[in-house]
Regions:
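Conserved positions within compact, well-structured domain cores
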Residues: 1-191
Length: 191
């Protein structure tokens, strides 16, 4: 099921006391607890099947180089779909979100995920949207998979992601990367 189109009036830049503001919902979502769209890294449209064979930037045996960091470029789904200063977050910005905010696993309007609260007292909800792999969504309500705008150093086939479950947060290590063709969520940021 494809999510409903999003209206810009619903997007709120939430000040968590960090270097950037975080959007109150995922790209393609209609509410904070809505999973939103699933996107391959560097692609700006959803599809029904997420595999190496359907990835726009496949160039066997590696992927095409579209940049080491796509934040704010034509390959950034947040920037393309939302416009303005909205963009994908970087590894540095996610590290800041992880280390300078409190994280609590909750159920919000029927969706599991983390409420992330900053020093300002403001918070965002990150739904456990799962991932879109091949023709189906896997791990919804148990796992959150979110793209980071950076590729993994030394490889052009994987991009950085942050993954969470109710048992923990997994950021920034090589084991917490995904093949670029996989369909993951994107949570935008802005200055």
């Amino acid at each position: 099921k494809k999510p409903a189109a999003q209206q810009s009036a619903q997007w709120v830049a939430v000040d968590l006391g960090l270097s950037v503001k975080w959007c109150n919902m995922n790209v393609g979502a209609s509410a904070p607890e809505d999973c939103g769209g699933y996107y391959s890294w560097g692609e700006t449209k959803q599809k029904d099947y997420y595999a190496d064979s359907t990835y726009l930037y496949t160039d066997k045996p590696y992927n095409k180089n579209i940049g080491k960091n796509i934040s704010g470029t034509k390959y950034d789904v947040a920037h393309v779909k939302m416009g303005g200063d909205w963009r994908m977050p970087t590894d540095k910005e996610f590290t800041e979100l992880r280390t300078r905010c409190t994280w609590k696993w909750i159920t919000q309007n029927g969706m599991e995920g983390f409420v992330v609260t900053g020093s300002t007292g403001n918070s965002i909800f990150l739904p456990a949207a799962g991932e879109y792999f091949k023709g189906k969504v896997l791990g919804q309500r148990g796992y959150g998979y979110y793209w980071i705008a950076d590729i993994v150093d030394g490889t052009n086939t994987k991009a950085q992601s942050y993954i969470f479950t109710n048992g923990g947060l997994y950021f920034g290590s090589y084991n917490n990367t995904n093949s670029r063709f996989q369909g993951l969520s994107v949570r935008p940021v802005c200055p």
